[in-house]
Structure formats: C-alpha cells, structure tokens
Amino acid sequence: EPKKSSVDDLFAKLRQAGAENVASSVKTVKDSSHKTTETPKKAVEPPKPIEPDLKMFERRDSALIAVDEMLVKKLKRVLADEENAMLNYLQSKKAQVALEKVLPSFENQLQTFVEATSKELIEAAMSGAQSLSKSLKSDLRKKISNATVMQVLSKKLADDIVYPLRERIQKCVESSDGSASEMSSLIRSTYREWKMKQVDKIVGDISRLAYSRGAYLVLETGVKVCWMVDPNGPPCADAEDNSLAGEVNCGEKFPTGDEHPVIHAGCKCLVVPSSR
C-alpha cells in the first residue's frame, strides 16, 4: 500500500506540473497575441518639393529681357572683334602659324568678355536683389559689387565661352596643318556659328546666374532658404534633389554642392526664403 501511495503521489505531481506548463503556454500565447495587435507606427512621409511661385519666375524673366538683348549684342561684338584681329594677323603671315600666335592669352581673352558684360550682369544681379529686398538701391549696391558678382560670373563666362571657343580654335589650327589661308576659313566658320547660334543658347544661363547671385547676396547668413523649381524649366534630377532637401541655412550648400542656381544648361530654378 505505501508503494501504491508513492506512485499516486508521483503521478499527481506530474499532472500538476503539466497543468502549470499548459497555463504558462496559454499565458505566453496570449501575451504574444496581445503584442501583435499593437497599432503600427505611421510611416514617415517622403519630403515634397515646395510649391513654385509662378509670379517670382515671371518677374525674373521680365527683368532679364532687356539684359539678354544687350548681352547678345555685346558678346557678338567681342566675338567679331576677336575674329577680325585673327584674320588680319593671318593675312600677314605666309609661314605656318601656331595657336599661341593667333589667340590672345586665356586671361586677356576672359578679361575682355568680363569687361564687355559686367554692366548688364550687375544690372541683372540688382534685379535679383530687389526681388527679395526692399532696401534702397544705394544700400543694395554695397552688397551687389563687381567683386561679389563677377567672381562667380567670370567663371561662368570662362566655362561657357572662353574654354569651348579656344578648344574650337585649337582644332582649326590643327586641321589647317599650319596653312594661314585654311586656318582663316575654319576660323570664319567657327565664329559664324558662335555669333549665329551659340551666343543665343547660353546668354539666358549667364543672366539667370547673375540674377540668382544678386538675390542670394542680400539674404542674411543663417536665414532658412528653399530651392524652388520652375515648372517651365527642363526636367532635372539635381534640381529635384535640392528642392526635396527642404530648408537650408543661407550660407550652406544644397545636396548638389551649390548655394544657388544655375546648376546646368537651361536651369531656371530660384532660391527663395522659406518665409517668403
């Protein structure tokens, strides 16, 4: 009888342990079930580009009409003078001619373009400044100086005109094999293309850069600014990236590494204060 009692006790303990395990399992399942029904966190919405202010773009385009017309005339005048100087030089030469004898130095050539266009480019920059500031013109002019504007525009003139033009003239020299008459013919063709086509293509980019530069210069450092894409401009992934960046402190750069437009050929974007 004692043996039977001990066996009964053993089974009783096992049944008790089994019941406790089942209860524990049920509790675990309930806890797990409870956790899965928690309200999921809301997904973070991707940033959206700021709404374009069409009036700001229209004001810019209107302000640059007269500037562009004068820039075209002055740039073509410089190109014509360069061409004539080269052709006159070549007419007096019978022997082979090298590039350095035909073209002025890079620095002198760039300086000629800078001096010819600085008046109109400063005017464009002032228009940009006045689009964001109501200060007196005399006060704005302290910020919109030849140095602050032309240090940026000089590089633009070099990249858009001087470098590519010199490259074309280099090819003229190489293709002519030193023949002055052949070189003259190729140079005429090159300058004709620049005066008839290229100048009109690039002048808008140059004046819009001056306008944006002027607007940027009157903003106080640290002011929150946004990159605004012109819906009438060409599609550009870089511009979209800058726009999606949202607010940036003035003085800091947008994702593309630029402080303000223009960042590519045909760029029509603007940088504007967030609290405009």
Summary of predicted features, one role per range:
Residues 2-200, 204-214, 274-276:
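N-terminal leader/targeting and assembly helices and adjacent pre-domain segments
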